[in-house]
Swiss-Prot record:
It comes from the Bacteria. GO terms for cellular component: cytosol; small ribosomal subunit. The keyword Disulfide bond does not apply. The gene is rpsT. Belongs to the bacterial ribosomal protein bS20 family. This is Small ribosomal subunit protein bS20. One of its GO terms (molecular function) is structural constituent of ribosome.
């Protein structure tokens, strides 16, 4: 464990951020799986929105977000 006060704070912050990022990615995956189980316009919009949110927060690359959304759109159409 770190001895310097600022390093201790950063270590605690890293844990919190990791939990938050993991939850966000998990929610994205859940939305995608829900759409794939039952493709509908409403579930597509929810999945697309969650993908965009993850990309805007830097959890996934923007190109991956575009690729995932395109693949979902082909399943919808």
């Amino acid at each position: 464990m770190a001895n310097i006060k600022s390093a201790i704070k950063r270590a605690e912050l890293n844990v919190k951020q990791n939990e938050k990022n993991s939850a966000q990615k998990s929610a994205m995956r859940t939305a995608i799986k829900a759409f794939e189980a039952n493709p509908s316009e409403e579930l597509y919009r929810a999945a697309s929105s969650s993908i965009d949110k993850a990309a805007s927060k830097g959890l996934i690359h923007t190109n991956k977000a575009s690729r995932d959304k395109a693949r979902l759109a082909t399943k919808l159409g």
